[in-house]
From Swiss-Prot:
Organism from which the protein derives: Nocardia farcinica (strain IFM 10152)
Function: Catalyzes the decarboxylation of four acetate groups of uroporphyrinogen-III to yield coproporphyrinogen-III.
Keywords for the protein's UniProt record, in alphabetical order: Cytoplasm, Decarboxylase, Lyase, Porphyrin biosynthesis
Pathway as given in its UniProt record: Porphyrin-containing compound metabolism; protoporphyrin-IX biosynthesis; coproporphyrinogen-III from 5-aminolevulinate: step 4/4
Name listed for the protein in its UniProt record: Uroporphyrinogen decarboxylase
Top-rank EC class of the record's enzyme: lyase
GO MF annotation: an example: uroporphyrinogen decarboxylase activity
BP terms from Gene Ontology: protoporphyrinogen IX biosynthetic process
GO cellular component terms, A-Z: cytosol
Residues annotated for substrate binding in this entry: R35, Q36, A37, G38, R39, D84, Y159, S214, H333
Cellular compartment(s): Cytoplasm
UniProt xrefs under InterPro entries: UROD/MetE-like_sf, Uroporphyrinogen_deCO2ase_HemE, Uroporphyrinogen_deCOase
CDD domains with a match to the protein in the record: URO-D (cd00717)
Subunit structure: Homodimer.
Length: 354
């Protein structure tokens, strides 16, 4: 990237997460958790006290410390950069904030072609704080891989069009159906922003990336293919030259797994609504799977957690027999805020034995 030096990518000699993601045989079953750095950890709550979410995301030292917390506590096999999917939008100059108890709120929703054409682009220097956070982490993590991430164009579009979180995505779908030309222009802009954000992280040294399409489960397979897939596919194509594993995840996307696999990622994330065995059939051979414990199971006591973890490991082994390239144990969504962190630590130890 112009004006930014590229960090020499680390050589990690024993990284089970990277092995599973690339079709090699890991030394143990790798495990990490979406939202592992967050409100379930008392040390996180203490560190974030009085500091806004977006403010935290633009403080390199804070980003580094928060990202490291679950590595120290749980011994997971990968770190995921502490950030938020709207960070590149905020960095580019879009007026938005993350409101406690609500989520991202956009001051001026995007509703017309003029609104789309007025959207800013993301310049590398605008995410310099994130880049510095990545560099600090690369130095701090030792042999633990670092996953960078971004929100997928569709999910970012939904926030911009709706003005915030939405249950039914009615304004988003209305634009899709009534004005597909404007829709694709909007997603083109957001795809450029997503690529720029991921490229900045890759140039700074992340070892893998995950694209979060949080709201894609609101779409039918036909609509996903027509209105979303080409843009997500472009994201994965544009960053392929970095040579790191690319993960694709959405919530409620069981019916979309085949299409999501076609987008070009190396790993497809699976939520708890579809077994890993069935996911392997839908995604097809040659791609690793990630998931898929229901986060609510962590509230059900140690026997239930162990039973479900063993079931998932067995389903994953069947998925491997069907042609899946690997398995990375994870939840089917993020860690819930009231989760007992001790349960997560015990789960990591169990998964490493399975």
């Amino acid at each position: 990237m112009a004006g930014m030096s590229t960090h020499t990518r680390r050589r990690l000699t024993d990284a089970p997460f990277l092995a599973a993601a690339t079709g090699a045989t890991p030394s143990r079953r790798p495990v990490w958790f979406m939202r592992q750095a967050g409100r379930s950890l008392p040390e996180y709550r203490e560190l974030r006290a009085g500091i806004g979410m977006l403010e935290s995301c633009f403080d390199p030292e804070l980003v580094c410390e928060i990202t490291m917390q679950p590595i120290r506590r749980h011994g997971v096999d990968a770190a995921i950069l502490f950030s938020d999917i709207v960070v590149p939008l905020k960095a580019a100059g879009i007026d938005l904030d993350i409101v406690a108890g609500v989520g991202p709120v956009v001051a001026a929703p995007v509703r017309s072609v003029a609104d789309v054409r007025a959207l800013p682009r993301l310049r590398p220097e605008e995410v310099g704080a994130v880049v510095e956070g990545v560099r600090l982490l690369v130095d701090a993590l030792g042999q633990t891989p670092l996953i960078g991430f971004a929100g997928a164009p569709f999910t970012l579009a939904s926030y911009l069009v709706e003005g915030g979180p939405s249950k039914h995505h009615e304004r988003t779908k209305a634009m899709m159906y009534a004005d597909p030309k404007t829709w694709h222009e909007l997603l083109g802009v957001l795809t450029d922003i997503t690529i720029a954000f991921l490229r900045a992280q890759l140039d700074a040294g992340v070892d893998a990336v995950q694209l979060f399409d949080s709201w894609a489960g609101a779409l039918s397979p036909a609509d996903y293919r027509a209105f979303v897939l080409p843009h997500s596919e472009r994201v994965f194509t544009e960053i392929a030259d970095a040579g790191v594993p690319r993960i694709h995840f959405g919530v409620g996307t069981g019916e979309l797994l085949g299409a999501m696999g076609e987008a070009g990622a190396d790993v497809v994330g699976v939520d708890w609504r579809v077994s890993l065995t069935e996911a392997a059939r839908r995604v097809g051979p040659g791609k690793a799977l990630q998931g898929n414990l229901d986060p609510a199971v962590l509230f059900a006591g140690p026997r239930a957690v162990e039973a479900h973890a063993r079931r998932i490991a067995e389903e994953a082994d069947r998925a491997l027999a069907l042609g899946a390239a690997g398995h990375i144990f994870n939840l089917g969504h993020g860690v819930l805020p009231d989760t007992d962190p001790g349960v997560l630590t015990a789960l990591v130890e169990l998964v490493h034995e399975l």
